[in-house]
Amino acid sequence: MLSLLSSDSSLLSLLFLFLIPCLFITSYIGFPVFLLKLIGLIKIKAARDNEKRDEGTYVVREDGLQRELMPRHVAFILDGNRRWAKRAGLTTSQGHEAGAKRLIDIAELCFELGVHTVSAFAFSTENWGRDKIEIDNLMSLIQHYRNKSNIKFFHRSEVRVSVIGNKTKIPESLLKEIHEIEEATKGYKNKHLIMAVDYSGKFDIMHACKSLVKKSEKGLIREEDVDEALIERELLTNCSDFPSPDLMIRTSGEQRISNFFLWQLAYSELFFSPVFWPDFDKDKLLEALASYQRRERRFGCRV
């Protein structure tokens, strides 16, 4: 009983301390104005409480990654398929097939972790210099992304698929299939898989320059209109809401970007994994993302 009285007394004291200032304020500014201000303060407090309560959802507790620090766009250079196959006593074709399957697995993991855009250097312009059998295998593997299982994944997870590159040497039948999958998924907004096929960073920049020259000749743009933002709109990655990767991952231990996203990687964080692409699994992905989240991105400025 004493504890109850004590509790009630404390409550009455708190109410008294609250009401006295309120009565003074209302007599000074008027009750309606005071009421509006009080409601506004309550709303602000509720919003802040919601932010604090939601902070727990930002951390992916299983692996310790923070969702608010997750890269929006992760780019991959899929390197090491042939060496992986040779080490395993398999054919080059089997190595590329394993690499194609791995891309879907890793893309799905990225999307689950909150990454918006995943891009992959699937076939470079320089790859045309390889022997015809391997080129044919690589072209056929692009069709792998249109098999029933992957199509179901794209629609189930609402993944938009885009294929960027020169495309002038790609067989007409394959171009038709590429167009079909792009059209079928173009309505999806929150997840985006970009595959660079017959792509090079130099070609991308050259393509943008030619487009700007044509627009200038037609009087659509002036010299003073040309800035970084305008050039970026002409790059092939303009299909993405986040055209510049926050993180670029290359497998196989090679430490170079090999003519991939020369403009877009200007301020990207780079991570080089020693494993061949078919061996790049969830643990390796989490390792790369954890490394990214520990870094302080300065974008050329001192902090």
UniProtKB/Swiss-Prot annotation:
Transmembrane intervals: 14-34
Pathway: Protein modification; protein glycosylation
Catalytic activity: n isopentenyl diphosphate + (2E,6E)-farnesyl diphosphate = a di-trans,poly-cis-polyprenyl diphosphate + n diphosphate
Protein name, per record: Dehydrodolichyl diphosphate synthase 1
Source organism superkingdom: Eukaryota
Main location: endoplasmic reticulum
Protein family according to the UniProt entry: Belongs to the UPP synthase family.
Disulfide-linked positions: none
Role summary: Catalyzes cis-prenyl chain elongation to produce the polyprenyl backbone of dolichol, a glycosyl carrier-lipid required for the biosynthesis of several classes of glycoprotein.
Molecular function GO terms recorded: ditrans,polycis-polyprenyl diphosphate synthase [(2E,6E)-farnesyl diphosphate specific] activity
Record membrane topology: Single-pass membrane protein
